[in-house]
From Swiss-Prot:
Residues 66-69 are annotated as: G3. Residues 160-162 are annotated as: G5. The gene is era. This is GTPase Era. GO terms for cellular component: cytosol; plasma membrane. Belongs to the TRAFAC class TrmE-Era-EngA-EngB-Septin-like GTPase superfamily. Era GTPase family.
Length: 305
């Protein structure tokens, strides 16, 4: 039987989580898929390209598209990310507006909703109140009412915690009901359509972002140079990658005193890389300065933006 053979009434489609930076979109994507496919960090604007996570159910296949958060851009990179996001919205079967339970709805949320309605005026909307584990029941109730009022019409609103799993299955049931009937788009063993190098570079970037403050996180980009069998150790893969920053001072911060921070980056990234490659890994990281790459069209193209 082909993976495209589906029972009568089977539903499938693409849903995008939309919201301000740091509303928990990537964490929720991982929770629904059941495996880590999107990196997470305490800094806003971590996601840099649409990541498709695939949820398999007996009655549906849900493709969750985790996009960069819509924001008012300060760099050419920011402008390009916003364009990617808007193009993604136009192709969705369902768009979910996400707001955290522990932060009041404000002008930023309204700006995002207006942007979504301009790009995808006919696409159904779903409201999701995230991070309910961080708020009281009364706070969650107020947020649900305010989000319902913001969306207007007959849009449904669902509370969820990606951390505890509370309401996860309820949310999947609601999403399934709102998707159209259709075929499977991916085989049952696929959880994402990201290529291996992209997943590895994102894991390294996540490890590099840990503990960073101010503007430095936005200046970090990662590129995989090559993945090769180790010449001397059987069953070991050598992963060679470059971390790019914009200034020499940023390079010094990432290397750390006596190379300690760089060592932590390697230590933290290796376990997830080993999971993906299914092999022991020697991770070789170099840090290079690529001056003002966020504003340079040529360098943005080289880095895949």
């Amino acid at each position: 039987m082909s993976f495209t053979d589906t029972p009568e009434g089977f539903r499938s489609g693409f849903i995008s989580f939309v919201g301000r930076p740091n509303t928990g979109k990537s964490t929720l994507t991982n929770a629904l898929v059941g495996e880590k496919i999107a990196i997470t960090a305490n800094q806003p604007e971590t996601t840099r390209h649409p990541i498709r996570g695939i949820v398999h159910r007996e009655d549906a296949q849900i493709i969750v598209v985790d996009t960069p958060g819509l924001h008012k851009p300060r760099t050419l990179l920011g402008e390009r990310l916003n364009e990617v996001v808007k193009d993604t919205y136009a192709d969705m079967d369902l768009i979910a507006i996400t707001v955290p339970a522990d932060e009041k709805i404000g002008p930023g949320d309204r700006w995002i909703l207006d942007a979504v309605k301009k790009v995808a005026p006919k696409t159904p909307l779903l409201g999701i109140v995230t991070k309910v584990d961080k708020a009281s029941r009364d706070q969650v109730a107020v947020q649900l009412m305010e989000l319902h009022e913001l969306l207007g019409g007959n849009s449904e609103v669902v509370p969820v915690s990606a951390v505890t799993g509370e309401q996860r299955d309820v949310l999947l049931d609601v999403i399934t009901r709102l998707l159209p009937e259709g075929p499977k788009f991916y085989p049952d063993d696929h959880i994402t359509d990201d290529d291996t190098e992209t997943r590895l570079s994102e894991l390294i970037r996540e490890a590099a972002l840990s503990g960073l403050k101010d503007e430095l996180p936005h200046s970090v980009a990662v590129q995989i140079d090559e993945i090769l069998p180790n010449d001397e150790r059987e069953g070991v893969l050598d992963v060679h990658a470059v971390i790019y920053v914009e200034r020499p001072g940023q390079k010094s911060i990432l290397i750390g005193k006596d190379g300690r921070r760089l060592g932590r980056i390697i230590h933290n990234a290796r376990p997830e890389i080993i999971k993906i490659l299914g092999s022991n890994v020697y991770l070789d990281l170099r840090i290079k300065v690529l001056k003002n790459w966020q504003q340079d069209p040529k360098q943005l193209g080289r880095l895949g933006f």
